Amino acid sequence: MLHIKSLDDGLELFKALGSEIRIEIIKILLENNGMNMNELAGKLKITNGALTNHIRKLEDCGIISISNEAASHGNQKKCFVHPDKILIDIESQEKYKNIYKTNLKIGHFTDFKVYPTCGIASSNALIGEVDDIRYFTHPDRYNADILWFAKGYVEYIIPNFIPFGHKIDQITISLELCSEAPGINDVWPSDISFKINDHKIAVWTSPGDFGNVRGIFTPDWWYPNWNQYGLLKVLVINEKGTFIDGLQVSDVSINEFSLDYHSTIKLKLEVEEDAKHVGGLTIFGKGFGNYNQDIDIHINYSPIISSGDKETEENSAIS
C-alpha cells in the first residue's frame, strides 16, 4: 500500500496518474503480473525511449518497481506494480498538533509464544536455526529485521514519552505483514489479530505469503523460495474507532483504554489457534520486503483537561 499523508505530498503521484497511457501501463502490468520493458513497449506500440519516460514518472512516485532479471541474452529490466492500493489522507490533521514519533525494531518484542514453521533473522544472516523457537530468546534477536511463525503471537511495548500531563488521542501503527506458509503461497489466508493491552481492536486477513518476485529490499542471500515481501498496513485507533488502511474495522476506540503520559502500551500481533484462517504471520523490518521500515508508530496527544478546567471553558463559551 502507498500511504499519502497529505494532498501536497501526493502532488507528484496525481501528476503521474493524470495520463491515459500511464494508466494503461499500470493495467497491463497488473494483468500480466509484471512485464519487461521491450514487451511493454511492444504492447503499447511506443518506442522504448518514450516508455522509459513514463516508467520513470511512475517509479519516482512509488507506483512501479523495477528489478533486473536474468534472460537468455543477459539481464533485462522487468516492471511490476508496487502497491496493492493507495491511501490518501484528505481530511486535515490540524486537530492533532502534538505528535510523538517512534518505531519498534522487529526483534524488540517483550513476550512471545510461537509455533513452527518459524524463524528469525537480521538483514545479514539467520539467527540460529529455522523452526527452533529457542532462538526467539537468543541475545542476537534484538538485531532481527524479520520474523515468522505459523501461529501464536509476539508482543511489543510501545515507547510512551509524551509530555507530562497529556493524554493519548490517537495511535497510528504502520508495518509490513504477510502470512507464513510452508515455502511460499500467494493464496494462504491468515487472520491476524491486533491487540492493545490484551484487548482485541482489529483483525486483518492476510491473503498470502508472497514470493513471486524478490522483495525490493530483501537481501541477496535470502532464499528465493522464502517469503519475499508483505503488504503495508496502516492501523489507526482514535475516538471514532479502529481503522485499517482508512476503513473502519471495529468500534473499539482509544477512549476505552484511558491512555496518558504514564500508561504502558502493549501491542500484540497474534494468529489465534481458533481463528478461521490459521495461516501464520511474517513481519518485515528494515532490510526486507518492499518497504524499508520497521514498525513505525505515531502517537497524537493533547493536554489533560480537569473537570474544573472544562467547567471554566463551558462558562466562557456561554458568556
Regions found by a protein language model. Give the residues of each.
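Extended, solvent-exposed segments with strong compositional bias
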Residues: 135-147, 205-260, 277
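Short coil-to-beta strand junction motifs in C2/discoidin
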Residues: 185-196
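Short beta-strands within extracellular/lumenal beta-sheet-rich domains
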Residues: 145-166, 249-253
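Amphipathic alpha-helical dimerization/coiled-coil segments
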Residues: 84-148, 152
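A short beta-strand element within beta-rich, extracytoplasmic domains
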Residues: 167-186
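Alpha-helical residues within the helix-turn-helix
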Residues: 42, 59-60
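Key DNA-contact positions within bacterial/archaeal DNA-binding proteins
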Residues: 49
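Short, cationic-aromatic polyanion-contact patches
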Residues: 15-21, 36, 69-92
